[in-house]
């Protein structure tokens, strides 16, 4: 936190907040414990002095303006699914919850855009778009995050390998600036070449430049056919080495994920259901690729499956298992979707390293993290987006005392981020 000296919320301010948002202002111990931390409580807890549950841009603006005039800190809050403590009110002050701003305001199907309030959950938008025959392509792992939070962090996700990140689908937004001023950035049209791109400056700014309250998002026609492939390998090295082959052969997976056997087994145990084979024809499996392809016809997908199968088998895959029914595809992706939840359930304390490295460095990078695990008292588990090199590395405390765990993890993180930088990678989350 900066050394800037903020003021405390006064009783007079609380009364004004109650005028702005009647019956939606909580003070002190009235505020639920859930608002003191995000999904990664290891980054600390702090209770805001006041919680305001806003329902409109105008309410957000009025609260922010009052706080600015009185030098009181403001923390915007969505679904609180973040993993880096960004929504924790470490300076006290006022937290503005946007979860009640959850309306899908309407579609413009001729221009392929949808307008929403920023508190809409990603899962709700995805399902609603599907009913319209449309697809909102960004697909972060946490489906119950707010879309505003996705925009504030420029979230990526499984489909980023083909469709890009959240930034690529934001056409316009309404933002409340720190002064309380309401501004509209961007436009419905796809090309805006004039002036500075303040829209893109706001995307990924995590609430530090303003609070996003409304969004106009690009959507696309939903593909008519989607199919997934489970591709097992003897080891992670062969698994990752296959990834460039997809693109060299002009295959364009909608999603391309890697998972090591240990993490898959733990997750299946957590879910109480076995989906992935552990051995095929006497060969022990060490890692998997989970690939999804989409197209406009079954025939097109059949050609893709045939070509993809030839490519991966030649590259060292043990077999190719086709999830060609909705149930099989759902089960395959349910395991991928529950990886983090299963890891969380199996440890007392957890921390995450989120990096992106060149795809040809994934295996070497993960081998390095495993070598560091041998030097530490905690466990390391990993999975990620093979198609774009975005890796999620989790440190699990076992029975370690919290202080010692944090101390060892700090050393681990320094080494891991340094190695990622050496490989030409970056912090990605």
Locate the predicted segments by residue.
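Short, acidic (Asp/Glu-rich) active-site segment that either coordinates a divalent metal cofactor
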Residues: 84-88, 94-98, 146, 208-214, ...
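Structural detector of well-ordered beta-strand residues that form the stable sheet scaffold
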Residues: 75, 115, 135-137, 381, ...
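N-terminal flexible segment immediately upstream of the FAD-binding catalytic core
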Residues: 1-65, 82-112, 263-275, 326-352, ...
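Glycine-rich, histidine-containing beta strand-loop boundary motifs that form or position
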Residues: 76-80, 87, 118, 140-141
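FAD-binding subdomain of flavoenzyme oxidoreductases
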Residues: 103-257
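C-terminal substrate-recognition/cap domain of FAD-linked oxidoreductases
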Residues: 27-37, 232, 240-415, 419, ...
